[in-house]
Amino acid sequence: MQKSEGSGGTQLKNRATGNYDQRTSSSTQLKHRNAVQGSKSSLSTSSPESARKLHPRPSDKLNPKTINPFGEQSRVPSAFAAIYSKGGIPCRLVHGSVKHRLQWECPPESLSFDPLLITLAEGLRETKHPYTFVSKEGFRELLLVKGAPEKAIPLLPRLIPVLKAALVHSDDEVFERGLNALVQLSVVVGPSLNDHLKHLLTSLSKRLMDKKFKEPITSALQKLEQHGGSGSLSIIKSKIPTYCSICC
């Protein structure tokens, strides 16, 4: 009877010990599994790509990201960019060690201003290279050719709205290019610009409130008066009463 009770107690102890060992083994396996998962997670976060994001390399500054040619932004180019890429503008940018220049496919004086001059004026609103340089330099050089007044004056009704779009643009550099183009045009067409001047002066008046544009706009107005003759002063004063004539 005592033997039976003793063996029964031993069995209970062994069973309890077995359950404890099983629980200990399961707990150990669970800890090991968690440790393995944790190490995998740490490996993924310490990948070269992640490390590059957390600690950018010095070479990243020398190699900035470029526009993806298949991206959404590149699928819808501006009108000027599309014309330029198709060879619709007969000049190309030549990179120099000191400064850039344009290379014309044929002498500029042999080119028709319609619609080339208007297309170049539309390009003044571009904000990316090389379109910014090609448009402003092409516009300037085209107006320097022999016979430019006769070619440019008939285009004024179509040129003025395009120049106005540049002058009302929110980008300061676009505005500056538009302002310079307006002065260049006034040198060529002279008093013929007076009939269209009032459409452009409102935007100049608004920018005149900005200190950084006060001097270049004042200088531009003086040149408009100089090349526009006596009739230009009353037009300028009607839109910008604070303007002081160069004749004063």
From Swiss-Prot:
Cross-referenced Gene3D superfamilies: Leucine-rich Repeat Variant
Pfam families in the cross-refs: ParcG
Keywords: Acetylation, Phosphoprotein
Compositional bias per record (Low complexity), positions renumbered to this chain: 39-49
Residue positions, PTM N-acetylmethionine: M1
Biased composition (Polar residues): 1-29
UniProt modified residues of type Phosphoserine: S47
Region (Disordered): 1-71
Protein name: PACRG-like protein
